[in-house]
Amino acid sequence: MSLLSVIVPCYNEEQTVADFYHELVKNDAFFRENEIDMELLYIDDGSRDNTVEEVKKLRELDERVHLVSFSRNFGKEAAMYAGLKKSHGDYVVIMDVDLQDPPSLLPQMFGYLKEGYDSVATRRVSRKGEPPVRSFFARLFYRLMKKISKTEIMDGARDYRLMTRQMVDAILAMEEYNRFTKGIFGWVGFQTKWIEYENVERVKGETKWNFWKLFIYSLDGIAAFSTVPLMIASLMGVLFCLFAFIFIIFIIVRKILFGDPVAGWPSLVCIISLASGVQLFCLGIVGQYLAKTYMEVKKRPIYLVKEEI
């Protein structure tokens, strides 16, 4: 009898916790036929609503349901990491509680594992129902990552992924504080099968990911899996030094040959302002990487557990 660990991060999801459970257990017949036992791990990321109480109600009905509740909101990345740490399964799957990750795909995903794959991942082939601006910047992010990172991150990739214990242990070996799981999946390697499906809208409630949070998350991903921004900052510094050197030679030659006085305060102010802006931009890039390093060396725990059942 093999064990499947289902990891479900939750943040203020009282409306969807029960719906997810009832949709997931529709696979029970498949699990029995294939001698698969299940543990369902709800990872509460410091919810302020009745998410914890809803999970406890499910626990009274089904002992396969477990709860790990954080002391505060640490973020989805911390919740996924905690779920992987707490899991005991021979196979582990990460799913969103809002049912945008269809549990009905699990039998198909297990079929691919039997073919010898270490991981079965999912990606959306459309973004129907999303705001156009959000979809545009999401595609832009994936195209950018493809160009500047050596780690492959598929366009439209979801966190919904079924993995073997060997792959999970490899991910857990990466104990970095600043986590970008989509990149970590690609970095550890292993043979992966991709399943594509149309975008599924939330069953209830509203997304907790606004544009600003997604923007910060994308910056974390770039800083975690690419050093190209640092190279760009260095290149811009070299180019401006070269420009300044050429401009100095131009002024000297103009003075010697034509005797023109050095003038043009407006243009000089514009050049200084532009150079200062570029310097601050490059300093911001360096600061982003320095901040990540600072958080790593402090070695604070990725999450703190308040309650566990």
Labelled PLM ranges:
Residues 13-30:
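Short, well-formed alpha-helical segments that are part of the catalytic scaffolds
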Residues 143, 180-309:
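Hydrophobic helical membrane-anchoring modules
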Residues 3-5, 39:
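Cell-envelope/extracellular polymer assembly enzymes that use nucleotide-activated donors
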